[in-house]
Amino acid sequence: MKSLSVIFKPKSSPAKIYFPADRQASPDESHFISLIHACKDTASLRHVHAQILRRGVLSSRVAAQLVSCSSLLKSPDYSLSIFRNSEERNPFVLNALIRGLTENARFESSVRHFILMLRLGVKPDRLTFPFVLKSNSKLGFRWLGRALHAATLKNFVDCDSFVRLSLVDMYAKTGQLKHAFQVFEESPDRIKKESILIWNVLINGYCRAKDMHMATTLFRSMPERNSGSWSTLIKGYVDSGELNRAKQLFELMPEKNVVSWTTLINGFSQTGDYETAISTYFEMLEKGLKPNEYTIAAVLSACSKSGALGSGIRIHGYILDNGIKLDRAIGTALVDMYAKCGELDCAATVFSNMNHKDILSWTAMIQGWAVHGRFHQAIQCFRQMMYSGEKPDEVVFLAVLTACLNSSEVDLGLNFFDSMRLDYAIEPTLKHYVLVVDLLGRAGKLNEAHELVENMPINPDLTTWAALYRACKAHKGYRRAESVSQNLLELDPELCGSYIFLDKTHASKGNIQDVEKRRLSLQKRIKERSLGWSYIELDGQLNKFSAGDYSHKLTQEIGLKLDEIISLAIQKGYNPGADWSIHDIEEEEKENVTGIHSEKLALTLGFLRTAPGTTIRIIKNLRICGDCHSLMKYVSKISQRDILLRDARQFHHFKDGRCSCGDYW
């Protein structure tokens, strides 16, 4: 496995590229079309366009080629400019324009120019409809879809196989499966072996609608299947949460390709089976298949979520060894993986090596700095993004507000929050409000936090009230906490956390009898409580623990070692469960309850399997509890080890008995 030092060694300077000077062009139409095809950027195309205008050879063919080329160069505005300044209004030019607008995601403009085509009296043909139908499938206008279908009949192109395929796809994607099936049924080609594509499109439509029975029925009825047929149905099962069925179908697949492997890897990652997602990726490599950018992004996502740094480094090494381009998708996935595995410097290095960054890339880096409490770097990165011309969206503001929250930068956080609406016309979501409530609460501004919750334009949810409750508890605002707890109960009286909040509130005031009443109510009404899990990667293998998990092969050794760790911590002042559990449980019961949290089990395995001085890295799906947080601090001081724990909210870097969060999380 490559080390980080090998992966991040300095690169040699790239070779300079020299472009030959422009050559004189003849006024021949075919010659200019050849020049248009040779253009690699918009500047070159503009140069050729200027010569065409000077020499007066802007025919319909040349105009259509100019529009097509500018679309391929991702310059739809230039395509529109060419069209507006050209007198050509024929099917060649309009088809090229509609196609280019569709391929550049200008769907509304594509439909508008189709309508303009009809108004100009230009007859649409079989090359027009597939792209305007695709645009409408993205827009989702059912009435327009039916009107376009009628137009295909009127213009006698409804029997064209490509038009029919586009109709089925459009109806399926706009949720009109009855119409999609009707067009499919009327297709005489569906019984031919070469009609696989229309079958795949319809099966995909039923998969998107979660109608796996109909999708499977169609799959079994196909005259012939290709890898796309298998991959479509596998993805349908994955998206429907039927991962076992997806795996069974994958095993039956005669020729597995990178698409089917990627679908399966992505499915395991999305359903939280990160170990299997990662192992499936390496199994694919052993079979001799080369991953594409989607495969790599999917497996890196699994590494990010589980903290599998070792596997992530191996994947990064594979990318370098095989000369895979560090595009936006792979680069962003690597940045996210390194940041979420606690290797911020590596994330920053990958980020700086990316030649092209989009909003997702910037957000991943800003969020990485933010969750590690690196406020100044997060804000600097945000400003660099603004200087680059990238416009912020609501997600990047979540990252910026997280940075302000984790560093208690109240005034700046409020400025960013106000700037969303005033400067960028972005309406804050519930998540933004929760962060601001947390920000005000952490600073002890309980009145302002409560007022914000009461006056929010969005109805506050449990998370919002819980953020306010934590602030009340931290700043001893018990009377306000009582009121907040009532709001929690009104929202969801059966939620276990609501009762626990009340218990803690009353226990802090010493009202033990009322606590007992609340606890009895809890026992009667609670149905289910989410269990926490933690991951720790050791020797390239992920180890997962759930709360109270005794399934690990080293369970006995872990239990003995955990007792030893807790005993040493108690000698140094650790008080198991104090101020964190319900007040009137016996001390030994408290230790039994709090001693089985998943992060404690992961920590203990880390001590058993790593050398002294090694940093222990743990990933937890829930917010770390106060008791475990306290133990981690004591253990980091006793063992002289760094403990890096990522919970549902942020990173906790325990070192010498202290935590980077400042004991507020």
UniProtKB/Swiss-Prot annotation:
- Chain positions covered by the region annotation Type DYW motif: 571-665
> What domain of life does the native source organism fall in?
Eukaryota
| GO aspect biological process, one term | RNA modification
Indicate whether DNA damage appears among the record's keywords.
no
Name recorded for this polypeptide: Pentatricopeptide repeat-containing protein At1g04840
User: One Pfam family from the UniProt entry?
Assistant: PPR
Name the family the entry cites: Belongs to the PPR family. PCMP-H subfamily.
InterPro entries from the UniProt entry? DYW_dom (IPR032867), Pentatricopeptide_rpt (IPR002885), PPR_At4g14850-like_plant (IPR046960), TPR-like_helical_dom_sf (IPR011990)
Q: Where are the PPR repeats?
A: 90-124, 125-155, 160-190, 195-229, 230-256, 257-291, 292-326, 327-357, 358-392, 393-423, 429-459
Which keywords does UniProt give here? Repeat
GO MF terms listed in the record are: RNA binding; zinc ion binding
Enumerate the residue ranges of region (Type E(+) motif).
540-570
